[in-house]
From Swiss-Prot:
Compartment(s): Secreted; Host cell membrane
Membrane topology listed for this record: Multi-pass membrane protein
Motif (Cholesterol binding): 492-493
Source domain of life: Bacteria
Transmembrane regions listed in the UniProt entry: 191-204, 211-220, 289-298, 306-318
Coiled-coil segments on the chain, per record: none
Record's signal peptide: 1-32
Organism: Paenibacillus alvei (Bacillus alvei)
Stated role: A cholesterol-dependent toxin that causes cytolysis by forming pores in cholesterol containing host membranes. After binding to target membranes, the protein undergoes a major conformation change, leading to its insertion in the host membrane and formation of an oligomeric pore complex. Cholesterol is required for binding to host cell membranes, membrane insertion and pore formation; cholesterol binding is mediated by a Thr-Leu pair in the C-terminus. Can be reversibly inactivated by oxidation.
Name of the protein described by the UniProt record: Alveolysin
Record-linked Gene3D superfamilies: 3.30.1040.20, Perfringolysin, Perfringolysin, domain 4, Thiol-activated cytolysin superfamily/Thiol-activated cytolysin, alpha-beta domain
Conserved undecapeptide (motif): residue ranges: 460-470
Activity regulation info: Inhibited by cholesterol and thiol reagents.
């Protein structure tokens, strides 16, 4: 009996041991199993949006406009022609202005919504994990990266200053910065058009350069803007493997949703920021020449042509303005001049990065947290391209010195435009048409600046029964000129003529 009791006790101990082993094994398997996916990763992955549509901007839509207009001014006739154009751009390099510097630092979390598209991004403020930022200054090698605790505008800016200081103290004397210059130019037609063409907020251009958009639309002025961006260095934020890598463990997707994250406003991160200086140059003229754009482009490439050449008249009626953002901007905060060589000096001055000529955040790029794809703003705008043509008055000088009786016929069309821009043509005739003129006869016929389709005809009386009148001049569509000289001479059988203008 005692042996049996001991045997039962042994079996109980064995069973207990097996149960303990199973519990331990189950616990070990449970602890080794993969953890549940972070709800931030799941929430952002589940956002449903089209990245090409969420940042699409529908700019000006023009349904009606007056295609042509005629203006009488100071003895001249000015024709303003308007043509509807469309412009589509998808910039990924977004310009930075002072008002948004604290919303566009490397690693900043933004919302992809209309505010972002309008260059006034909204931030998502939440507790963050440390963030690695790096700089591409030459020579730093392993010293080019720093980990930022609690990344925000202040801490990231401080870290960037530290990286720049390290380069300045250790490597600036042995390493030079490569020249990285971005250049763009465009004629100005409307606020949305120039904003899209140069990828900059039109309000900034208007506030710094003073563009008179109304004068441009009315054809009173022609304006070109050139943008020079000189990049000294770029600071990049480390891209996360998962969105949750950016946020503290205490942050949930529900918190991000409360702070604006949604299908209509998915989250972004500023992946890199370019630092340097930006120079905006405004070229403005009151010239009505159709060669203004060509003249301005040539001047931008070669300022020495201002004093001579075929476009001298355009330059004499032009003024130039330059505004510098970044670097030692106080040296050339705003320069207004009629000498483009002064503008060229502004562009060349302070082109080297140094402690006295610091860099300024000039542009940034953001990525969608869902897949790290680049956030591009898709602009689509319509605008009116305005072309002005100025016509001056002219005159026809008739001179008859031939040995015969002559008759002249002169007429022309005068054109204008109605309120809808439709051309109105009125036929005008010289009151001396078909009168007999003997030598020597000379007269001047004034022509208004809106004259066209000029017709000049002259005939002489031969005295021959079978050919009483012989044509001497028979010209249609003579172009309007300040002086149109018509001369006839010779004899009845051998009349001569010439027209010069």
């Amino acid at each position: 009996m005692k042996k049996k009791s001991n045997h039962l006790k042994g079996r109980k101990v064995l069973v207990s041991l097996l149960v303990s082993l199973q519990v331990f094994a189950f616990a070990s398997i449970s602890s080794a199993a993969p953890t549940e996916p972070n709800d931030i990763d799941m929430g952002i992955a589940g956002l449903n949006y089209n990245r090409n549509e969420v940042l699409a901007i529908q700019g000006d839509q023009i349904s009606s406009f007056v295609p042509k207009e005629g203006i009488q001014s100071n003895g001249k006739f000015i024709v303003v022609e308007r043509d509807k154009k469309s412009l589509t751009t998808s910039p990924v390099d977004i310009s930075i202005v002072d008002s948004i510097t604290n919303r566009t630092y490397p690693g900043a979390i933004q919302l992809a919504n209309k505010d972002f598209a309008d260059n006034q991004p909204s931030l998502v403020m939440a507790a963050r994990k440390p963030l690695d930022i790096s700089i591409d200054l030459p020579g730093l090698k392993n010293e080019n990266t720093i980990s930022v605790q609690n990344p925000n505008y202040g801490t990231v800016s401080s870290a960037i200053d530290q990286l720049v200081s390290t380069w300045g103290e250790k490597y600036s004397s042995t390493h030079t910065l490569p020249a990285r210059l971005q250049y763009a130019e465009s004629m100005v037609y409307s606020q949305n058009q120039i904003s899209s063409a140069l990828n900059v907020n039109a309000k900034v251009l208007n506030g710094t350069l003073g563009i008179d958009f109304n004068a441009v639309a009315n054809g009173e002025k022609k304006v070109m803007v050139a943008a020079y961006k000189q990049i000294f260095y770029t600071v990049s934020a480390g891209l996360p493997n998962n969105p949750s890598d950016l946020f503290d463990d205490s942050v949930t997707f529900a918190e991000l949703a409360r702070k604006g994250v949604s299908n209509e406003a998915p989250p972004l991160m500023v992946s890199n920021v370019a630092y340097g200086r930006t120079i905006y140059v405004k070229l403005e003229t009151t010239s009505k020449s159709n060669d203004v754009q060509t003249a301005f482009k040539l001047l931008l490439n070669n300022p020495s042509i201002q004093a001579s050449g075929q476009y001298k008249d355009i330059y004499e009626n032009s003024s130039f303005t330059a505004v510098v953002l970044g670097g030692d901007a106080q040296t050339h905060n705003q320069v207004v001049t009629k000498d483009f060589n002064v503008i060229q000096s502004v562009i060349k001055d302070n082109a080297q990065f140094s402690s006295k000529n610091p860099a300024y955040p000039i542009s940034y790029t953001s990525v969608f947290l869902k897949d790290n794809s680049i956030a591009a703003v898709h602009n689509n705008t319509e605008y009116i391209e305005t072309k002005t043509t100025e016509y001056s008055k002219g005159k026809i000088k008739l001179d008859h010195s031939g040995a015969y009786v002559a008759q002249f016929e002169v007429y022309w069309d005068e054109f204008s435009y109605d309120a809808d821009g439709q051309e109105i043509v009125t036929r005008k005739s010289w009151d001396g048409n078909w009168r007999d003129r003997s030598a020597h006869f000379s007269t001047e016929i004034p022509l208004p600046p809106n004259a066209k389709n000029i017709r000049i005809f002259a005939r002489e009386c031969t005295g021959l029964a079978w050919e009483w009148w012989r044509t001497v001049v028979d010209e249609y569509n003579v172009p309007l000129a300040s002086d149109i000289n018509v001369s006839i001479w010779g004899t009845t059988l051998y009349p001569k003529s010439s027209i010069t203008h």
